[in-house]
Swiss-Prot record:
InterPro entries found in the cross-reference section: Ald_DH/histidinol_DH (IPR016161), Histidinol_DH_CS (IPR001692), Histidinol_DH_monofunct (IPR022695), Hstdl_DH (IPR012131)
Family per similarity comment: Belongs to the histidinol dehydrogenase family.
Record-given protein name: Histidinol dehydrogenase homolog
Gene Ontology cellular-component annotations: cytosol
Organism from which the protein derives: Shouchella clausii (strain KSM-K16) (Alkalihalobacillus clausii)
Cofactor requirements of the protein: Zn(2+)
Active site: 318-319
A Pfam family this chain is assigned to: Histidinol_dh
Enzyme class: oxidoreductase
Cofactor detail note: Binds 1 zinc ion per subunit.
Disulfide bond entries: none
Protein residues bound to Zn(2+): 250, 253, 352, 411
Amino acid sequence: MAQYIKQGKSESELKDSHGKVEQTVASLIARIEKEGETAVRELSRQFDNWDPEQFRLSAEEIEKIVRSVPDQVKADICFAQEQIRHFAEQQRASIQDIEVETRPGVFLGHKNIPVNSVGCYIPGGRYPMVASSHMSILTAKVAGVKRVIGCTPPINGEIPAATVTAMHFAGADEIYILGGVQAMTAMAVGTETIEAVDMLVGPGNAFVAEAKRQLFGRVGIDLFAGPTEVLIIADDTADGEMVATDLLGQAEHGPTSPAALITTSKKLAEETVAEIERQLQTLPTADVAKVAWEEHGMIILVDDLAEAVVEADKLAYEHVQVLTENPNYFLDHMTNYGALFLGPETNVAYGDKVIGTNHTLPTKKAAKYTGGLWVGKFLKNCTYQRCTPEASAEIGRIAERLCELEGFIGHKAQASLRVKRYGK
């Protein structure tokens, strides 16, 4: 039976803090809907101390910013984008349009049609999330989206040059230096200077994530995103240093980022706790990671790998790193996760930044019903049908009876007209 050696905050405690975020975001959205560009500008000034003549960067400004970025940084961005583009292109190639003749004269099909416009949010705040440019903008472009715009906030009153460079290289059609709820709402509802989009994607802080949730419906979204999560599944072949390093490597994202260990080894669990305490003494981001670990960290001791799968599927975490003798066991048996990282040779940082899979992944148990962002999220699977006259009459006779069975007389009339015109 699973034994909790360490537990984080309860769901009820987390919900209490979320209620305040929900109310704040709702009021900001309502204000922007009412006041438009004026509210966007005032909120940008209030939250980011940012009030430029135009939020949108001109082609000349982008060119100047790109030139200011060191060549090595640009080369690394290009390398990462090559990996992400290649995998996204392979995923796109796996999605096929079809047309089949299901019975004589009845032709059914579907087409995968890209969304016309997408707004991508590239977070800033504590860290410039350069990689989010690749994951959202580039992936949308590979999917065939015609208009892809990107918003990213200023950082300490400055334009994040590396982020803008990545957005530009990824293929953004419009780049705005604008952050927070004001950016999400402006993209969703439109303003005097920003044309509304059909879909919002990308991660962000609690306020950005809540804005996306509240705006869902008038626009599509990729998924509901919460604080990043990491789960490590390990047996006695793993070592405490690697487990602790990989847990803290994600805990540094923010003070509410859950980091969990499921292990069959009590010895490893104890080593990991000690190693985390040791690493927190020197980790530059310990001020954040320590809070995340103390308030949201978790260690679960299980009897065997089968029980580890059960517990891992209950958590349904965003990132699941497997440090066991046979990592593929979890590839074969787990069903609820955002992304799997199999073996000590890979890790979550690779997926977050460069290896090629998308880092926008489900959190807060959403992995129970959805995967992460990929080219398929930007495609609408739309069906169509057509019939020969003979098939129309045949289908119509059955449709007449089924419509009458349900009491839909107007529906029956549609079928009856075809039977009359095309039947023999």
